[in-house]
Amino acid sequence: MSNMESMIVEEKSQIKLVDREKTCPLLLRVFCSTGRHHSVSEYMYGNVPSNELQIYTWQDATLHELTSLVRDVNPDTRKKGTYFDFAVVYPNFRNNHFQMREIGVTCTGQKGADDNKTLSQAKFCVGDFLDISITPPNRLPPMRRQRPY
């Protein structure tokens, strides 16, 4: 009888660095909200939430880098212990609705597992929106959905 082995292989996408001198940046439309994500219904019928932040960046931008850019324009988010819960809002062409997918969490003043995740690794596509739930340090950190492993 032969022995059979089973191996679980986690596929990690290659980080493709972008030559930022030669590559045109994309317009990242970011919507921040305190304590919660915006409702997906706020993105329907050509509408978007009113508090838009426009950032020109590249697909290799990390969540840590995006956190820094949001902190630069929003002084309230600079306090140590502030959580940034990132989600991509993207169109679902099958049912003509938008869907939201959480992609990571960063925290001001703390290193985290998602800090170096890039937009490309999060499968961000040009035209998607970025929705950020900002949780101040005096509140509980955002609850993470269980990852389907």
Language model: regions and residue ranges:
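Ubiquitin system architectures
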Residues: 2-149
